[in-house]
Design a protein with these regions (language model features):
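Gly-rich Lys/Arg/Thr-decorated short loops/hinges at beta-loop-alpha junctions or inter-strand turns
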Residues: 1-3
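Active-site-proximal beta-alpha core segment in soluble small-molecule metabolic enzymes
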Residues: 5-9, 13-16, 28-193, 205-206
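Active-site loop ensemble at the mouth of alpha/beta enzyme cores that anchors a bound cofactor
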Residues: 200-216
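Conserved PLP-enzyme active-site core in the AAT-like
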Residues: 24
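Short, well-ordered beta-to-alpha junction loops that form the rim of enzyme active sites
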Residues: 196
């Protein structure tokens, strides 16, 4: 019978990795992505180790967000995939979770929700990752609809996700950056483009927010 496997998480190493990220980010804010139990490292322990030096945590589900709050984490929490029911929108509003809007259905649900506290919304635009997000052509109309809603705070953020930023010889990251900038050229808003590979290898993509997971 094999011995049980044990993973030892070096929180000092995580803190050092975050310091490197902060130095690279300069004046950008940092969202530490800790979905899937911080990729198996333990979301609670990781979030407690990093909470003093990040601006937000990114998670995949409402359950992950609630887990952080119940553990006493006060740092802002963002739902990267948005919400999937009216109940989740209500919970996000009550707990001050920011949420993504990745399609027309989510946009309509946000606008039609019965909530008293406006939501901070990030609009994700699919510029080539093809995982989630609205099309670049939809951006202006969706932005206008959300901006006009009392359910949405004034600080809407526009985001995209790079598909191959870890390949420095593939210029598709530059193509994606051009697509998002063209789509939002008539908007004056905060933005979030960088994942870990983008922050390290493509400094021209650094924006108001950097969303970092693997490099931490």
């Amino acid at each position: 019978m094999a011995r049980p496997a044990k993973a030892l998480i070096d929180l000092d190493a995580l803190r050092y990795n975050l310091k490197v990220a902060i130095d690279l980010s300069q004046y950008s804010k940092i969202m530490a992505v800790i979905k899937a139990d911080a990729y198996g490292h333990g979301a609670i322990g990781v979030s407690k180790a990093l909470s003093d030096n990040v601006d937000a945590f990114g998670v995949a589900s409402i359950e992950e967000a609630i887990e952080l709050r119940e553990a006493g984490i006060k740092t802002p929490v963002h739902l990267l995939e948005g919400t999937f029911s009216d109940d989740e929108i209500t919970i996000a509003s009550k707990n001050n979770f920011s949420i993504s809007c990745v399609n027309q259905k989510q946009k309509n649900a946000i606008i039609e929700a019965q909530i008293s506290v406006p939501l901070n919304v990030w609009i994700f635009v699919d510029t080539g990752m093809h995982r989630l997000g609205i099309t670049p052509e939809e951006l202006i109309s969706i932005y206008k609809d959300l901006s006009a809603s009392d359910n949405v705070s004034d600080n809407i953020i526009i985001a995209t996700h790079f598909s191959c930023a870890d390949d420095l010889e593939n210029d598709f990251t530059s193509t994606q950056l051009s697509r998002i900038k063209n789509a939002m050229k008539d908007l004056s808003v905060n933005t979030s483009f960088c994942n870990s590979a983008g922050l390290i290898g493509w400094p021209q993509t650094r924006a108001d927010w950097n969303r970092l997971g693997i490099m931490l």
